[in-house]
Amino acid sequence: MSRLRIFADTNPATPEFDSRDGDAIAAQLQKIGVTFERWHASAPVEPGATPEQVMDAYRADIDRISAERGFKTVDVVSIAPDNPKREEMRAKFLDEHFHKEDEVRFFVAGSGLFTLHVDAKVYEIECVKDDLIAVPDGTLHWFDMGPEPHFVAIRFFTEPDGWVGHFTGTEIAKQFPRYAPEKPHKAS
């Protein structure tokens, strides 16, 4: 289940806000310019589906958000717990960074933790199946896929080479807990 916790950036122990309600999550994130939506497939997505089958199941939403935000390319990324490069992949974006284009992800299956650092607050968003998150360009954040990553996500890009992390060099991400899903997520 999706979850948003908001902390003061100086107090990683006690959240000021904690909710699993999708509407409450969307309302809180909207205040900082982040979009949070729930999507539903127009057809079942079976385990082992090709990227084309995944995108076809969400075509109406993909086309809508691409038109609204000017995305030029869309792809599907799939990470499994047995991936031999999982530790390297996890470590890639664990430190605070930003991108020069929006980071938009839709979770077809599995989960991951986006953590945003905005105005002396830390927004910890657990995204799960059917969640779309759109993080505006320039927003400081980090992403944790967990020690045994399992997710399938649709990614949106305005420029194929524009999605590069620019790291801040701060240690704030290390002050907050790493992602450990409450229970394993099964492919959907």
From Swiss-Prot:
Residues binding Fe(2+), per UniProt: H97, H99, E103, H141
One GO molecular function term of this record is:
iron ion binding
What keywords sit in the KW lines? Amino-acid biosynthesis, Dioxygenase, Iron, Metal-binding, Methionine biosynthesis, Nickel, Oxidoreductase
Named cofactor requirement(s) = Fe(2+); Ni(2+)
Specify the pathway: Amino-acid biosynthesis; L-methionine biosynthesis via salvage pathway; L-methionine from S-methyl-5-thio-alpha-D-ribose 1-phosphate: step 5/6
| Keyword Amino-acid biosynthesis carried by entry | yes
Site (described: May play a role in metal incorporation in vivo): E96
Marked site (May play a role in transmitting local conformational changes) residue numbers = D102
Q: Name one Pfam family in it.
A: ARD
The record's listing under InterPro entries reads: ARD, ARD_bac, RmlC-like_jellyroll, RmlC_Cupin_sf
Q: Which Gene3D superfamilies match?
A: Jelly Rolls
CDD domains, A to Z: cupin_ARD
Site, as annotated: Important to generate the dianion? R105
Per its database record, what is this protein's job? Answer: Catalyzes 2 different reactions between oxygen and the acireductone 1,2-dihydroxy-3-keto-5-methylthiopentene (DHK-MTPene) depending upon the metal bound in the active site. Fe-containing acireductone dioxygenase (Fe-ARD) produces formate and 2-keto-4-methylthiobutyrate (KMTB), the alpha-ketoacid precursor of methionine in the methionine recycle pathway. Ni-containing acireductone dioxygenase (Ni-ARD) produces methylthiopropionate, carbon monoxide and formate, and does not lie on the methionine recycle pathway.
* Listed name of the protein: Acireductone dioxygenase
Species annotation: Xanthomonas euvesicatoria pv. vesicatoria (strain 85-10) (Xanthomonas campestris pv. vesicatoria)
